[in-house]
Structure formats: C-alpha cells, structure tokens
UniProtKB/Swiss-Prot annotation:
Located at the top of the head of the 30S subunit, it contacts several helices of the 16S rRNA. In the 70S ribosome it contacts the 23S rRNA (bridge B1a) and protein L5 of the 50S subunit (bridge B1b), connecting the 2 subunits; these bridges are implicated in subunit movement. Keywords: Ribonucleoprotein, Ribosomal protein, RNA-binding, rRNA-binding. PANTHER family: 30S RIBOSOMAL PROTEIN S13/40S RIBOSOMAL PROTEIN S18, SMALL RIBOSOMAL SUBUNIT PROTEIN US13. It holds the Pfam family Ribosomal_S13. Part of the 30S ribosomal subunit. Forms a loose heterodimer with protein S19. Forms two bridges to the 50S subunit in the 70S ribosome. GO terms for biological process: translation. Signal peptide: none annotated. InterPro entries: Rbsml_uS13_C (IPR027437), Ribosomal_uS13 (IPR001892), Ribosomal_uS13-like_H2TH (IPR010979), Ribosomal_uS13_archaeal (IPR019977), Ribosomal_uS13_CS (IPR018269). GO terms for cellular component: cytosol; small ribosomal subunit. This is Small ribosomal subunit protein uS13. The keyword RNA-binding applies.
Length: 150
C-alpha cells in the first residue's frame, strides 16, 4: 500500500487503536468519539479516511491528538462537541476517555444529590426518559404462572 511501516496497534490519546481498521472506524474506538466526530477529525487533519490506521505516521498521529485536544481551534463546530455549556465553566468542549467517564458520573451524582426526578430514577435504577416500565426494565428471574388444580 505505502512505503511506511505497518503497525498493528497505534496509541492515540491513551487508547490503543487497531491498525487493521480504516481510520474513521479506528478513531471510533476512542471513548467519546463517534462517527461524525471521527469524520470531522479526519477532514480537519487532511488525512485519507480510507487509509488503514496502521499506516499512520508519527506526525499524523500527533495531528490527530492535537485536533482531539482542542477541536474548536481547528474549526470543528461546537454543536459536534459532547460537552456543550459545561455545568461548572459554561464553555463548549469535547471530552474523551476517562475524563468523560468521570464527568458523566459527576453529573449523575449531582442529579442524585439535588433529588430531581432524573436523579431519583437513577438511584432506583429505573429509566429516566419516560419509557414504560410495566413489561421492560424488570429485575430478577422470571416467574411462571402456575395452573389451578381442578
């Protein structure tokens, strides 16, 4: 394919990416990066989206990490970020990996602490978004119906 050395694992922002996958698919293995964000990163970094991730050079990996660190600086619109109008700072940012997991858990704990509807539903392990619970979200083993004796 290319003259450069093929690598089976590529380390991008604390995540090992599969070198056999196409670049857009490999970037989606990073927690917090979906298909739209992966396409935007590849477009902004001026990389071939069909290129296998194993053929990335060190410079290209650094460019991807720079875009992931501050996507707004590279012209990615704020509506693509996963943390708009942050509760603490009020700024738009895109958070990935363990930072996203921590922030997500802090948000849930804040909802529980202020005892809002969503927080209470989280505490009880029930759905927060209005789904019906008569037949779904049940816990425990299924109990069969016993027949009456004749």
């Amino acid at each position: 394919m290319q003259n450069s050395e093929f690598k089976y694992l590529i380390r991008v922002s604390r995540t090992d990416l599969d070198g056999n996958k196409k670049l857009i698919m490999a970037l989606q293995d990073i927690y917090g990066v979906g298909e739209a964000m992966a396409r935007a990163i590849v477009r902004v970094a001026k990389l071939d989206p069909n290129k296998l991730a194993g053929y990335l050079t060190e410079e290209e990996v650094k460019k991807i990490e720079e875009v992931l660190a501050d996507p707004a600086k590279f012209g990615i619109p704020s509506w693509m970020f996963n943390r708009r109008k942050d509760y603490v700072t009020g700024e738009d940012k895109h958070v990935i990996e363990s930072d996203l997991m921590i922030i997500k858990q802090e948000d849930i704990n804040r909802l529980k602490r202020i005892r809002c509807y969503r927080g209470i539903r989280h505490e009880l392990g029930l759905p927060c978004r209005g789904q019906r619970t008569k037949s779904t979200f049940r816990r425990g083993p299924t109990v069969g119906v016993s027949r009456r004796k004749k």
